[in-house]
Amino acid sequence: MIQMQTILDVADNSGAKKLFCIKVLGGSKRKYAGIGDIIVASVKEAIPNSKVKKGDVVKAVVVRTAKEIGRPDGSYIRFDGNSGVVINNQKEPVGTRIFGPVARELRAKKFMKIISLAPEVL
């Protein structure tokens, strides 16, 4: 569960290292974002000479959350931390690589490019 002011790690090579959630998209009073949801975030930490700079306001899709999510078969999945992937307005990732595993729920939300770039889908 990601809410306003949550700090996320970045799971791609866009150049950002830490994101600060500004807004959860999808409804006027929406409080939380889960895996596959889009947030608006500010870049709090970035590497030099990268595609995104510190202070940029970007959109990101949540790919890992520390809060477990239930699956239809009764199992649960959770990750060690909260991570996101920086995306553009066409919902395509800005980076060309994804680091670490991502959840299978991204497939249902139509983020196929992220699924194909990820080294492991859990």
Curated annotation (Swiss-Prot):
Gene Ontology BP, a term: translation
Record GO cellular component, one term: cytosolic large ribosomal subunit
Entries under Pfam families matching the protein: Ribosomal_L14
Record flagged with keyword Cytoplasm: no
Keywords in alphabetical order: Ribonucleoprotein, Ribosomal protein, RNA-binding, rRNA-binding
Gene Ontology molecular function: large ribosomal subunit rRNA binding; structural constituent of ribosome
Similarity annotation: Belongs to the universal ribosomal protein uL14 family.
Subunit text: Part of the 50S ribosomal subunit. Forms a cluster with proteins L3 and L19. In the 70S ribosome, L14 and L19 interact and together make contacts with the 16S rRNA in bridges B5 and B8.
Function of the molecule: Binds to 23S rRNA. Forms part of two intersubunit bridges in the 70S ribosome.
Protein name (Swiss-Prot/TrEMBL): Large ribosomal subunit protein uL14
Species of the source: Geotalea uraniireducens (strain Rf4) (Geobacter uraniireducens)
